[in-house]
């Protein structure tokens, strides 16, 4: 596998693409010595997404549905996450496909993000709605167990910000209204 990162001059990632591995094999057919080429893995198709030295992001995104059939979550999670997090040239259809996959694999994605100990991607994960309230609570426990206090503090703040329960002030006001007097 190869991960390629395209960065702006300020160091901000513009796009990150995962090129999975692939295998080539030849089968010999009978006494005629005819060889058949077999390709396994989406890495070959991903490497064909170039034209005159320029990457074709739409072509790269089009391989994802087939990759979901052939590749493991170990390959697919970085492919989907990287395209969402650094979404240069991402079409609405491709975004929807990647988001669906990230939501389906949200527990594994969260585990990967917690291991990296990077706050920006973790915040993006919850801010965009890929993670649920229960997951942020679990993430706080994991970060605490790993003694990552900056992560714990940030996760607690995001939980309050993103998953705040509605205040019951309207109910309290109606019970203690003094307008009747």
Model-found features: residue ranges?
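Ankyrin repeat structural motif
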Residues: 118-126, 148-160, 164, 176-177
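Solvent-exposed loop and capping/linker segments of extracellular ligand-binding repeat ectodomains
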Residues: 1-102, 107-129
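Ankyrin-repeat boundary/"N-cap" motif
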Residues: 9, 99-114, 126, 134-144, ...
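Generic marker of "main functional regions" within proteins
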Residues: 45-49, 123, 135, 153, ...
């Amino acid at each position: 596998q190869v991960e390629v990162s395209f960065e702006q001059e300020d160091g901000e990632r513009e796009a990150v693409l995962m090129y999975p591995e692939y295998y080539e094999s030849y089968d010999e057919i009978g006494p005629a010595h005819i060889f058949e080429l077999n390709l396994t893995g989406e890495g070959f198709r991903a490497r064909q997404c170039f034209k005159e030295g320029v990457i074709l992001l739409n072509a790269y995104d089009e391989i994802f549905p087939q990759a979901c059939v052939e590749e493991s979550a170990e390959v697919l999670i970085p492919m989907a996450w990287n395209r969402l997090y650094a979404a240069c040239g991402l079409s609405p259809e491709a975004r929807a496909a990647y988001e669906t996959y990230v939501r389906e694999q949200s527990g594994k994605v969260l585990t990967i993000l917690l291991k990296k100990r990077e706050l920006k991607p973790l915040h993006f994960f919850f801010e965009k709605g890929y993670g649920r309230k229960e997951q942020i609570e679990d993430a706080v426990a994991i970060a605490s167990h790993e003694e990552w206090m900056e992560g714990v503090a940030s996760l607690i703040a995001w939980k309050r910000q993103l998953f705040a329960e509605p205040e019951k002030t309207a109910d309290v006001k109606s019970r203690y209204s003094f307008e009747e007097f």
